[in-house]
Amino acid sequence: MEYAARRNQKGAFEGFYKLIMRRNSVYVTFIIAGAFFGERAVDYGVHKLWERNNVGKRYEDISVLGQRPVEE
């Protein structure tokens, strides 16, 4: 009984191992792709958070900066 329960718990890890970690080339590709897409996701999230917290304080928000008054 105990062996069957233990074997069912390892199923997810065995599947992950067989899918990703069995061959070194697949494992390295998975790590590099994960790092690339993880960095992109963190960069996007931090950029959106920065923009949301600094609305009205950014260069793009100042409409008259660098413009000369029009003389009529």
Swiss-Prot record:
> What does the record say about its membrane topology?
Single-pass membrane protein
Q: What's the protein here called? A: Cytochrome b-c1 complex subunit 9, mitochondrial
Which parts of the chain span the membrane according to its record?
26-42
Which intervals lie on the Mitochondrial matrix side per UniProt? 1-25
GO cellular component labels: cytosol; mitochondrial inner membrane; mitochondrion; respiratory chain complex III
Q: Which SUPFAM superfamilies does the entry link to?
A: Subunit X (non-heme 7 kDa protein) of cytochrome bc1 complex (Ubiquinol-cytochrome c reductase) (SSF81514)
Keywords, alphabetical: Electron transport, Membrane, Mitochondrion, Mitochondrion inner membrane, Respiratory chain, Transmembrane, Transmembrane helix, Transport
Q: How does it assemble?
A: Component of the ubiquinol-cytochrome c oxidoreductase (cytochrome b-c1 complex, complex III, CIII), a multisubunit enzyme composed of 10 subunits. The complex is composed of 3 respiratory subunits cytochrome b (MT-CYB), cytochrome c1 (CYC1-1 or CYC1-2) and Rieske protein (UCR1-1 or UCR1-2), 2 core protein subunits MPPalpha1 (or MPPalpha2) and MPPB, and 5 low-molecular weight protein subunits QCR7-1 (or QCR7-2), UCRQ-1 (or UCRQ-2), QCR9, UCRY and probably QCR6-1 (or QCR6-2).
Q: Gene that codes for this?
A: QCR9
Role according to the record: Component of the ubiquinol-cytochrome c oxidoreductase, a multisubunit transmembrane complex that is part of the mitochondrial electron transport chain which drives oxidative phosphorylation.
Q: Where's it mainly located?
A: mitochondrion
Q: Kindly list the biological process annotations in GO that this record carries.
A: mitochondrial electron transport, ubiquinol to cytochrome c
Task: Tell me the residue ranges located in the Mitochondrial intermembrane compartment per UniProt.
Answer: 43-72
Q: Name the family the entry cites.
A: Belongs to the UQCR10/QCR9 family.
Question: Can you say where in the cell this protein is located?
Answer: Mitochondrion inner membrane
